[in-house]
């Protein structure tokens, strides 16, 4: 009798489960199931897509967008696609704007809380490509207390392969991002770690530590934070050569403005200066800025102490080109020894990656 009851209960349970399964609606297959949100085509164009069937408007923004040229989307079956021609190899941040709301690519494995990264590298042989067959350095996020700003801040620190097991003291490059970015920019979209790893593995650069501080604050306060907080932190926590001949500063765009602020406020503290797509703040009178920074007196001090002072631009299409020209004209007037370079890729991360590639090969080699 007990066996019959147990069998009846089992059969009833099985029938109920089949009934529930039959009543559960099957999910409808949509184009989103097979959608690849970023595609690089053989002709060098890149297509960015998002599934938004109920959206009224969708747009795309990112580092790879042609300057001043909006891209009109094509919508089909709820998929909005944007085709961008002639995308240079590189890493690009991007996001969609759906009915006025920022949306970070839900299909991308690189999407974080506030960004998505598209890697366009068809050959895998670019100077910034990741090479699995070489030693790799370490990238650390370091937190420090800024007495200058009265708050906790972060910086990224790249140390070369073998640093942890070594004993030698190394020179330091302080590498600053541009406006609207943070210390995250150079290691991600700027591919700094891969560029440095490749150069070191090929014997093209001096082993060094590269510090990428957060420049997203008032320019004059950044200079104070760098000198009073960032550099002392590095020199207390890493094996570094703590003298001007083994200390370099470099920054792009807004970071270039900060670079000039740093060197003219501290003309005897850095042996190498690279200002990338930068100049003096375009919103201020350059003569007043020259007076504030005492550039005429400090130029002589810089000439005596600095082994290399380089100004770069991304060519006439670089939005800081005029600002750079103004700075160069002033430097000519005051007798500052500097070198000028142009990379014809505009105000883009492709330009600045080339700059870092060139710069890193030259730093700390002059006697």
Over which residues does each language-model region extend?
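Short, intrinsically disordered low-complexity segments
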Residues: 1, 13, 26-27
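Bacterial N-terminal signal peptides
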Residues: 8-17
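Non-catalytic cap/lid and distal C-terminal segments of serine-dependent acyl enzymes
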Residues: 23-30, 34, 40-69, 74-367
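Bacterial N-terminal signal peptides that target proteins for export
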Residues: 1-9
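Sec/Tat signal peptide C-region and signal peptidase I cleavage site
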Residues: 18-22
């Amino acid at each position: 009798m007990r066996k019959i009851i147990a069998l009846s209960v089992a059969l009833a349970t099985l029938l109920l489960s089949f009934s529930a399964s039959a009543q559960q609606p099957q999910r409808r297959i949509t184009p989103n199931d097979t959608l690849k949100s970023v595609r690089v085509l053989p002709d060098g164009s890149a297509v960015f897509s998002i599934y938004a069937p109920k959206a009224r408007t969708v747009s795309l923004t990112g580092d790879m967008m042609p300057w001043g040229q909006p891209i009109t989307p094509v919508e089909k079956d709820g998929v909005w696609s944007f085709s961008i021609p002639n995308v240079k190899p590189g890493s690009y941040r991007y996001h969609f704007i759906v009915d006025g709301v920022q949306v970070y690519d839900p299909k991308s494995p690189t999407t974080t809380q506030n960004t998505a990264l598209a890697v366009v590298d068809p050959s895998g042989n670019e100077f910034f490509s990741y090479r699995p067959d070489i030693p790799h350095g370490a990238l650390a996020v370091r937190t420090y207390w800024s007495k200058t700003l009265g708050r906790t801040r972060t910086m990224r620190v790249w140390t070369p392969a073998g640093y942890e097991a070594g004993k030698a003291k190394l020179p330091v490059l302080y590498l600053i991002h541009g406006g609207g970015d943070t210390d995250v920019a150079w290691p991600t979209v700027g591919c700094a770690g891969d560029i440095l790893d490749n150069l070191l593995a090929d014997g093209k650069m001096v082993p060094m530590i590269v510090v990428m501080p957060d420049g997203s604050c008032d320019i004059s306060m950044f200079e104070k934070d760098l000198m009073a907080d960032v550099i002392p932190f590095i020199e207390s926590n890493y094996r570094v050569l703590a003298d001007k001949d083994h200390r370099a500063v470099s920054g792009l765009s807004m970071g270039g403005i900060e670079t000039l602020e740093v060197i003219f406020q501290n003309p005897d503290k850095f042996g190498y200066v690279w200002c990338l797509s930068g100049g003096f703040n375009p919103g201020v009178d350059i003569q007043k800025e020259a007076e504030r920074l005492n550039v005429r007196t400090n130029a002589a001090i810089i000439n005596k102490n600095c082994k290399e002072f380089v100004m770069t631009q991304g060519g006439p299409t670089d939005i800081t080109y005029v600002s750079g020209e103004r700075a160069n004209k002033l430097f000519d007037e005051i007798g500052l020894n500097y070198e000028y370079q142009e990379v014809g890729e505009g105000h883009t991360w492709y330009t600045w990656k080339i700059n870092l590639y060139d710069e890193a090969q030259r730093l700390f080699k002059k006697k």
